[in-house]
Amino acid sequence: MDIATEWTTNANEALTITLEPSKGKGKGKEVSNGSEKSHVFNPIFTYPIYGDVETILGYKNFELNLKMDASTMLPLVTVKFSDKLEFDGISFDDPVERLLEFLPEETATDEAEWEEKRVKELGDGFKPVGKEFGTFSVNSEKYTVHRSTLLDPETLKLHLRLQIFVPLFIEAGSYIDNEDDRWEIYIVYNAEKEIVGFSTVYCYWFYEPSAKESKAPKDASLEQLQKQPFSPTLRKRISQYVILPPFQGKGLGGQLYTLLFSRFYADPNVYEITVEDPSEAFDDLRDRCDLKWLADQGFPSEVFRMLQTTSAHGEKAGDNRTGRTKVVAGAFWTKWLEEHRLKYKLAHRQFARCFEMILLACLEVSSPTKKRNIKDARLFIKKRVYVRNREFLEELGGKIEVMSKLQETYESMEEDYARIMKPVLGYVKDGLKKRDRNDAGNEEAKRVKVE
């Protein structure tokens, strides 16, 4: 073994995280007597702490442990190694100090000190921060979500402890501005009052004239504008989103997203619900949750009914014109889709993706217009791809090259959409079936069957 290998440790393997449960259930909790099982796991990423190569240099048999109380997240950092490399004039970064830079100042490095703090914090019984926001159950296990803001001192203290999971489990994840009062935090507790996950949400305030309010004329003076009545609305942006590894694989992420979305949607002051820089895994979760929710709202049946009467080139409802070859949809669809996007409070790109996946689900439905529906689905999807990538596509050259690239992109998207849709296709098809209940008097709709 060469010296480089002998004194080098993979940081992802060296760092272990331990969630130490507290004893007891119900309103009060005491320090664990060691009979409960601890959760031990490794991070996915350590490059924000230990550099791009994620290695720790200068130690043999190096082990670093971040222990946290499972309910309060009080942190303790301990280290073990068999030997340390020392050269005159050469020094290595202290891996403990590097980790402590990402943790709150209260982090203990002595286990006796940490146990003393645990006793003090849990002495009067454990109480979750914030107020109860909602509940959900998975496999007969109940989970409670609490909402709070960083203006609350206890919530801020908990957030400073929790935020270490962001760089360790979210690629390119970064800390938020703790002094910004627009941040909300949603914390998920299990029946034992252990934290199983959390999400931070940012509130963007902006003003939109309500339907009942008259808009100021274009030539209005500043004084007139200042007197103009407006209704405050906000955009909820889901930012950090973490389900801790011991509790993953149970569907908790989808349940939390569904709870957040449904509650935000029900708030009349919320104009739009967005997600900040989602990972591929979160994109899949979000797509499937949104598709299930749209199916529950009956949106697939609305799309299907429109496809029976109005082509992709339609300028108004019932316009069945065909034959145009340009990648463009009629003005009616542009307006119809925007009205429904606003109705369902989804961001532009997300609503477009969900609509396109529902279109593809409609292609599996037998109907007199099925052949045209297939062509229309391609037109809708290619249109969005073309608009979003216009500059790149125009650099390809002539029309043949552009159309070829669009077809290639469409086929790739169709394959990815099928992968995403597979677990929730049944929900979407159920949404399509709603047309029979909604249009009991429509004989053509009655004849349509889901294959």
Curated annotation (Swiss-Prot):
Predominant subcellular localization, coarse grouping: cytoplasm
Locations listed in the record: Cytoplasm; Nucleus
InterPro entries, per the entry: Acyl_CoA_acyltransferase, Hat1_N, Hat1_N_sf, Hist_AcTrfase_B-typ_cat-su, Hist_AcTrfase_HAT1_C
Residue segments, region Interaction with histone H4 N-terminus: 52-54, 202-204
Function: Catalytic component of the histone acetylase B (HAT-B) complex. Acetylates 'Lys-12' of histone H4 which is required for telomeric silencing. Has intrinsic substrate specificity that modifies lysine in recognition sequence GXGKXG. Involved in DNA double-strand break repair.
SUBUNIT field: Component of the HAT-B complex composed of at least HAT1 and HAT2. The HAT-B complex binds to histone H4 tail.
Site feature location: Interaction with histone H4 N-terminus: 183
Family from the record: Belongs to the HAT1 family.
Domain of life of the native organism: Eukaryota
Glycoprotein keyword on record: no
Name the record gives this protein: Histone acetyltransferase type B catalytic subunit
GO molecular function: histone binding; histone H4 acetyltransferase activity
Positions that bind acetyl-CoA: 241-243, 248-254
Key words, A-Z: Acyltransferase, Chromatin regulator, Cytoplasm, DNA damage, DNA repair, Nucleus, Transferase
Natural source organism: Yarrowia lipolytica (strain CLIB 122 / E 150)
Catalytic activity: L-lysyl-[protein] + acetyl-CoA = N(6)-acetyl-L-lysyl-[protein] + CoA + H(+)
Active site: 276 (proton donor/acceptor)
One GO term of the biological process aspect: subtelomeric heterochromatin formation
EC number: 2.3.1.48
Gene: HAT1
Gene3D superfamilies named in the record: 1.10.10.390, 3.40.630.30, Histone acetyl transferase 1 (HAT1), N-terminal domain
One Gene Ontology cellular component annotation held by this UniProt entry: chromosome, telomeric region
Cytoplasm is among the record's keywords: yes
